């Protein structure tokens, strides 16, 4: 069955199945239909997230094992709830000690029956797989290696020994293994297994092989057959060799259970129509909802203020497109250099075997691969080697991109390598094994490149309005008009009515309520710039760079309601992560301890200081904007809960929820202490969804409603199936500055009266026809109306 609403719980050793079971009565009363569980299969011990799976055949013991999961499912069913599970088909933990399949592969090499499980280029390593686990070069670490029976130990790591090698001298023993222990820095350029993005601790799994699919999904399918689970969330489908084929096989195996995929859509990109899923996990909806509450003219002015204050070079945070392109080059040539080398080897081998393609030098192929990868505007193309590419696939590698890529070659004839690489990437040069491998690998690398260069680099460099730097977002065009939103929602209702929608997840860089606060700054850029100047003057320790200061002060304002004793300890790690991800002055792999100490000192003295002058200035500013933050928070929540799709609530977000980037947003679930206005709204909307499945479900209709009058652009409204009306105030600060609602009216559908479900006055109703916006929003900046008798 399709859920009416899901509630995401982050399971971890500190919040196992038994703790989730205790929350069931509360969550059932809240109004959701399903619990959405983070991964539950056996993971690396102590894992706080569960995406580092080590055994697909067992439910994680640290969470309570299969018995605990089945008990949770039983308790949920008793309260009318089902379970949706997040699964991870793309990768496993590269931890041999815990991952016994990988252990067998390392012991037996390519001859192991499990060798097909993992995406390893054995030829590139001379028959060995590189394990970049050493703290320094091998020569410096030999003294820390020790043989213990049939096991090789390095500190707390364990590796299997190839049969018959345990008694060899250590240097010879190392040479005889099916793996090579290497310095961790070698992962960047020498790695010969596919990984999750740039994380060598997570090794790619080849679920495109039927036997691997069956082995890795058997337990999940059993839990579905037994009624323990009702639906699935698929993590990172873009990492797979053939996402469409995988989803088709999964749909057949599950009997068509409700399934959504964590597919990040870029710009106006649409989910492939042939995918056998209900839709996405909802980041496309997040971008549209956030954009509704962002002022386009103010965002443009804020960009100017940011440039004046921080003075970033265009390609280091001053211009969005230039920043993305520079970041993409950096990632392609550094963090993903090993992936580029793998593609180059494949392309060179294909060309060497075909006289028509021969004589393209490896350097030219490598250059062509790099230049095309950085020009792909979406995460990846979807292509099957040997089959004609679709129009959408061809649009990922346009003629313009090819022309631009060729400009880096000084000899025009050598630039022909670009044409070869494009044809390989689009599957035009046949469907042989190597061609298929290149096609898949190119798409997988494109996905990793986009994620690392945009989400994990450019989002931390281009920071005029950090509420816009969110997963699936477009900081270059952060605002969304009512017309654009209605167009999106209408398309979802028509094409993907059971898709997921979200505002906050375990991966969002800031919770929805933090982003809502920060987005208000797009309505008062001049006031914000003045405040930053005051804060800068009042802080006794200078920021090590002005871009960091801009981000830090926006973050501090976004968390203004956070308890004073928590602010610093939560803000500092988030900002240190931001500067490391940005990679402008320090990074995860090339850290600058002095710079990072300066960041910590600045945060402690200013943005993270729980009292004093700066805290007072931010509190005063926040108090002045509080009514407009309220409108943003309630408006976004109500739109999310009533628009087409299946809303997913992240744990705690039914009430005010302030969280920063992980791990801050992955703390154990805690029931809100005191119900607030947002929780009342949430429970009312969820109860309505549960009561009226035909109104909000897959057969439900969506109709934009029209407002007229001088303030009409500040009112967004829509009707669901002729029975429920949502109306929200947008950009309320600009509205107030413009004189309020005045003559603005909303045209309600005929067939009233319409009862205000959020009103403190029982029986507050409106007849059909026009209603004055000032009257509609007299009690609060949002309204949820139900046609009496529906």
Regions found by a protein language model. Name each.
Residues 72-120:
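Hydrophobic or amphipathic alpha-helical targeting/insertion segments
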Residues 90, 234-240, 557:
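Conserved short loop/turn motifs at secondary-structure junctions
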Residues 119-186:
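DnaQ-like (DEDDh/DEDDy) 3′-5′ exonuclease domain used for proofreading
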Residues 45-49, 94-95:
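Short glycine-biased active-site loop of nucleotidyltransferases that positions the nucleotide triphosphate
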Residues 1-45, 53, 57-62, 70, ...:
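Carbohydrate-interacting/catalytic domains
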């Amino acid at each position: 069955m399709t859920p009416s609403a899901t509630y995401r719980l982050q399971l971890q050793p500190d919040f196992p199945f038994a703790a989730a079971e205790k929350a069931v009565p509360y969550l059932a009363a809240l109004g959701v239909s399903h619990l959405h569980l983070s991964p539950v299969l056996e993971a690396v011990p102590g894992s706080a997230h569960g995406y580092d799976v080590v055994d697909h055949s067992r439910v994680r013991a640290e969470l309570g094992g299969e018995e605990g999961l089945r008990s949770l499912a039983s308790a949920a069913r008793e309260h009318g709830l089902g379970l949706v599970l997040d699964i991870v088909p793309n990768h496993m933990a590269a931890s041999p000690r815990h991952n016994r399949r990988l252990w067998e592969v390392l012991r037996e090499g390519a001859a192991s029956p499990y060798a097909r499980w993992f995406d390893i280029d054995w030829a590139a390593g001379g028959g060995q797989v590189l394990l970049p686990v050493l703290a320094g070069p091998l020569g410096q670490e030999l003294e820390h290696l020790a043989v213990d029976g049939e096991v090789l130990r390095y500190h707390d790591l364990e590796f299997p020994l190839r049969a018959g090698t345990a008694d060899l001298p250590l240097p010879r023993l190392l040479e005889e293994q099916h793996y090579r222990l290497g310095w961790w820095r070698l992962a960047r350029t020498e790695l010969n297994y596919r990984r999750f993005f740039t994380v060598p601790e997570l090794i790619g799994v080849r679920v495109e092989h039927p036997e691997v699919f069956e082995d890795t999904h058997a337990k999940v399918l059993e839990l579905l057959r037994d009624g323990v689970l009702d639906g699935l969330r698929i993590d990172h489908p873009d990492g797979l060799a053939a996402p469409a084929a995988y989803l088709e096989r999964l749909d057949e195996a599950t009997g068509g259970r409700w399934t959504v995929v964590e597919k990040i859509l870029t710009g106006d990109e649409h989910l492939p129509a042939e995918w056998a899923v209900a839709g996405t996990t909802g980041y496309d909806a997040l971008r549209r909802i956030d954009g509704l509450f962002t002022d386009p003219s103010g965002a443009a002015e804020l960009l100017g203020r940011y440039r004046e204050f921080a003075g970033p070079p265009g390609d280091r945070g001053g211009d969005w497109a230039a920043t993305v392109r520079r970041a993409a080059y950096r990632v392609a040539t550094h963090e993903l250099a090993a992936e580029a080398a793998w593609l180059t080897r494949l392309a060179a081998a294909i060309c060497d075997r075909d006289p028509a393609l021969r004589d393209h030098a490896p350097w030219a192929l490598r250059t062509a691969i790099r230049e095309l990868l950085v020009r792909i505007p979406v995460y990846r193309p979807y292509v099957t080697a040997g089959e004609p590419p679709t129009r959408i696939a061809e649009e990922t590698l346009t003629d313009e991109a090819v022309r631009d890529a060729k400009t880096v070659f000084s000899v025009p004839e050598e630039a022909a390598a670009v044409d070869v690489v494009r044809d390989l990437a689009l599957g035009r040069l046949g469907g042989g094994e190597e061609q298929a491998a290149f096609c898949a690998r190119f798409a997988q690398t494109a996905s990793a490149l986009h994620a690392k260069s945009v989400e994990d680099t450019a989002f931390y460099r281009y920071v005029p309005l950090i509420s816009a730097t969110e997963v699936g977002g477009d900081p270059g065009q952060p605002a969304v008009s009512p017309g654009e939103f209605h167009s999106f929602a209408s398309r979802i209702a028509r094409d993907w009515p059971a898709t997921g929608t979200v505002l906050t997840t375990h991966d969002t860089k800031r919770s929805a309520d933090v982003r809502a606060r920060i987005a208000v700054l797009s309505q008062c850029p001049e006031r914000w710039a003045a405040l930053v100047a005051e804060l800068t003057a009042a802080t006794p320790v200078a920021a090590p760079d002005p871009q960091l200061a801009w981000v830090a002060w926006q973050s501090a304002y976004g968390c203004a309601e956070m308890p004073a004793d928590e602010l610093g300890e939560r803000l500092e790690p988030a900002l240190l992560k931001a500067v490391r991800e940005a990679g402008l002055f320090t990074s995860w792999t090339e850290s600058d301890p002095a710079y990072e100490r300066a960041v910590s000192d600045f945060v402690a003295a200013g943005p993270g200081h729980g009292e004093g002058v700066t805290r007072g200035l931010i509190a005063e500013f926040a108090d002045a904007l509080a009514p407009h933050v309220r409108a943003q928070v309630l408006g976004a929540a109500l739109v999310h809960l009533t628009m087409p799709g299946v809303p997913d609530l992240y744990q705690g977000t039914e009430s005010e929820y302030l969280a920063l980037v992980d791990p801050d947003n992955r703390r154990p679930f805690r029931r809100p202490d005191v119900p607030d206005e947002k929780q009342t709204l949430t429970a009312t909307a969820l109860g309505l969804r549960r009561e009226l499945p035909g109104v909000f479900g897959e057969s439900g209709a969506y109709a934009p409603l029209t407002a007229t009058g001088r303030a009409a652009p500040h009112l967004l409204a829509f009707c669901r199936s002729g029975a429920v009306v949502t109306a929200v105030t947008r950009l309320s600060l600009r509205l107030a500055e413009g004189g309020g609602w005045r003559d603005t009216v909303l045209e309600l559908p005929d067939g009233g009266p319409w009862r205000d479900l959020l009103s403190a006055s029982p029986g507050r109703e409106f007849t059909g026809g026009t209603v004055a916006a000032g009257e509609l929003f007299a009690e609060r900046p949002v309204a949820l109306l139900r046609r009496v008798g529906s």
